[in-house]
């Protein structure tokens, strides 16, 4: 039987696999904000990125290792393909963290070996022990993944795993890379690995899965029953294609059904000991932060964190909940940090009051960021009678979202009505030469006119593919959150902003998206799964930290 830590280890890959969602690219400050919140959430491992991909990715992982890595905090992990170049860059990036891990991988399915890697099984059997041993010479904590394990030949898979453990791997990850398996199949795969790998007792079994068939969470829970003790997941289930297994769904399934899962940990069914180290009251805040910063909206009926997760429309359901919450609710909303608390802050409130409330909410801002957030708070307080925690969340998340800005919005002015053509006047500052230009455009509506004017000024070709707006809180004076996604050369960039004027919010969101596009094109990066491994060592970043 595989090594058992006595509970489930939560391995969060929001900053690596989650960021590979189209349009979910994050800047350094955003990654840091999410990493700090993941630490507050209580995840065991943060996979902070793929350091070899680009100098920017290296810097982000290194910064997280420096500022989030603590003796009593999460393990900081980086991803590396099975090549010395990747592994060396990964080690250098995570080295500042007291608790660090190198996560290296290679494909084991025949379809990947033939069509992607152009390698034989014999090649893989030679590469795995060599690269795991090299990684082990740098750090003690090594995770090895058999990419596309669920479609690999079982006997070959067992052989690869045995070699990886013998070379020093302490965690063996079994990915369902394309979300292909069903729960019974995935559970059997984990069970068979336990039975057929002689040295599996020297490593923790981890699972990683995608949601292409909507089965990722179910597969993971079946894996837990069969000995998996680390779950690789993302906040809100974001990730490539249909996404990854959702952290909040997995954690709350194990929390609510603890009496069922306890027996798989040799506990009494009524044991009160938690199955994970997650602070569940931080779940909602973490979900909103990731949604705001990535621009990926959570569907209203999403389990645990969706807007309707604790809403009841049916009269029968409403009556039952009023009489006894347990009639139709299996989770207390407060357990996941959901509350309607309103704070008595207004236009007369001072910096210390705002700072104190932000600290209570878990935000630790620098002096400069606090000054900026307070200025936005005062501006909002002049226009909005009642400030809520959601308003403060919107202010702070937008504060850290701002990318490196080539463009800054100076003026937004629109005119529209049922008897006039929507017209927008926009002034935009180019920070590279500090010049300011103004353009006027007509559109099908005020937002369309704003976007047309911005495109005239920015001269950055793109296609608007999504515009969405939602209210942060209730009331006529509520903040409106706008998310805009644009596409160029098959890459998607998102922008997010909040304002009581949704047209102004739309203009700011569009400028944020344009800045992301411009910033992204200044850097090049590689994909850990799709880029050729052949030249990885030759193309090692000569000085990745700069």
UniProtKB/Swiss-Prot annotation:
Keyword annotations of the record: Amino-acid biosynthesis, Branched-chain amino acid biosynthesis, Cytoplasm, Leucine biosynthesis, Manganese, Metal-binding, Transferase
Compartments reported by the entry: Cytoplasm
Residues holding Mn(2+): 17, 208, 210, 244
Catalytic activity: 3-methyl-2-oxobutanoate + acetyl-CoA + H2O = (2S)-2-isopropylmalate + CoA + H(+)
Keyword Cytoplasm carried by entry: yes
Cysteine pairs bridged by disulfides in the record: none
Cofactor(s) in the UniProt record: Mn(2+)
A biological process term (GO) from this entry: L-leucine biosynthetic process
Entry's Gene Ontology molecular function annotations: 2-isopropylmalate synthase activity; acetyl-CoA C-acetyltransferase activity; manganese ion binding
EC primary class: transferase
Pyruvate carboxyltransferase domain sequence ranges: 8-271
EC assignment: 2.3.3.13
Pathway: Amino-acid biosynthesis; L-leucine biosynthesis; L-leucine from 3-methyl-2-oxobutanoate: step 1/4
Listed SUPFAM superfamilies: 2-isopropylmalate synthase LeuA, allosteric (dimerisation) domain, Aldolase
Function: Catalyzes the condensation of the acetyl group of acetyl-CoA with 3-methyl-2-oxobutanoate (2-ketoisovalerate) to form 3-carboxy-3-hydroxy-4-methylpentanoate (2-isopropylmalate).
Family: Belongs to the alpha-IPM synthase/homocitrate synthase family. LeuA type 1 subfamily.
Subunit relationships: Homodimer.
UniProt protein name: 2-isopropylmalate synthase
Protein source organism: Prochlorococcus marinus (strain MIT 9215)
Gene this protein is translated from: leuA
């Amino acid at each position: 039987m595989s090594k058992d830590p006595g509970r489930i280890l939560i391995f969060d890959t929001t900053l690596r696999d989650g960021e590979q969602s189209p349009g979910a690219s994050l800047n350094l400050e955003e990654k840091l904000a999410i990493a700090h919140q993941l630490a507050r959430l209580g995840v065991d491992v943060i996979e902070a990125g793929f350091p070899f991909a680009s100098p920017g990715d290296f810097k982000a992982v290194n910064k997280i290792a420096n500022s989030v890595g603590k003796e009593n905090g999460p393990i900081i992990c980086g991803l590396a393909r099975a090549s010395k170049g990747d592994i060396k860059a990964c080690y250098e990036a995570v080295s500042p963290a007291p608790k660090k891990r190198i996560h290296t991988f290679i494909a084991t399915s025949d379809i990947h070996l033939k069509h992607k890697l152009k390698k034989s099984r014999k090649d893989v059997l030679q590469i795995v022990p060599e690269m795991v041993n090299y990684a082990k010479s740098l750090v003690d904590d090594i995770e090895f993944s058999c990419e596309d394990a669920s479609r690999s030949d079982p006997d070959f898979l067992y052989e690869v795993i045995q070699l990886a453990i013998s070379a020093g791997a302490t965690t063996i990850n079994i990915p369902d890379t394309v979300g292909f398996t069903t729960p019974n199949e995935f559970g059997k795969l984990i069970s068979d690995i336990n039975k057929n790998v002689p040295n599996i007792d020297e490593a923790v079994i981890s699972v990683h899965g995608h949601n292409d068939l909507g089965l990722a969470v179910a597969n993971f829970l079946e894996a837990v029953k069969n000995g998996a003790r680390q779950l690789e997941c993302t906040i809100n289930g974001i990730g490539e294609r249909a996404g990854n297994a959702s952290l909040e769904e997995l954690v709350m399934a194990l929390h609510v059904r603890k009496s069922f899962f306890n027996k798989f940990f040799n506990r009494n069914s009524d044991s009160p000991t938690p199955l994970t180290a997650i602070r569940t009251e931080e779940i909602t805040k973490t979900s909103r932060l990731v949604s705001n910063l990535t621009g990926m909206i959570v569907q209203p009926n999403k389990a645990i964190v969706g807007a309707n997760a604790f809403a009841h429309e049916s009269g029968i359901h409403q009556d039952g909940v009023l009489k006894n919450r347990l009639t139709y609710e299996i989770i207390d909303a407060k357990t996941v940090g959901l509350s309607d608390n309103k704070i008595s802050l207004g236009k007369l409130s001072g910096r210390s009051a705002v700072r104190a409330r932000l600290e209570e909410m878990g935000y630790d801002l620098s002096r400069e960021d606090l000054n900026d957030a307070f200025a936005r708070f005062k501006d909002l307080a002049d226009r909005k009678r009642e400030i809520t925690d959601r308003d403060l969340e919107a202010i702070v998340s937008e504060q850290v979202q701002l990318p490196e800005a080539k463009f800054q919005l100076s003026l937004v002015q629109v005119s529209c009505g049922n008897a006039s053509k929507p017209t927008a006047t926009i002034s935009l500052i180019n920070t590279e030469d500090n010049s300011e230009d103004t353009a006027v455009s007509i559109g099908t509506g005020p937002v369309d006119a704003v976007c047309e004017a911005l495109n005239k000024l920015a001269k950055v070709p793109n296609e608007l593919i999504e515009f969405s707006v939602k209210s942060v809180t209730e009331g006529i004076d509520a903040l409106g959150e706008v998310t805009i996604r644009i596409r160029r050369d098959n890459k998607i960039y998102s922008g997010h902003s909040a304002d009581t004027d949704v047209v102004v919010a739309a203009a700011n969101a569009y400028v944020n998206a344009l800045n992301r596009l411009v910033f992204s094109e200044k850097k090049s990066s590689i994909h850990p799964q799709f880029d050729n491994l052949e030249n990885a060592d030759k193309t090692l970043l000569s000085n990745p930290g700069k």
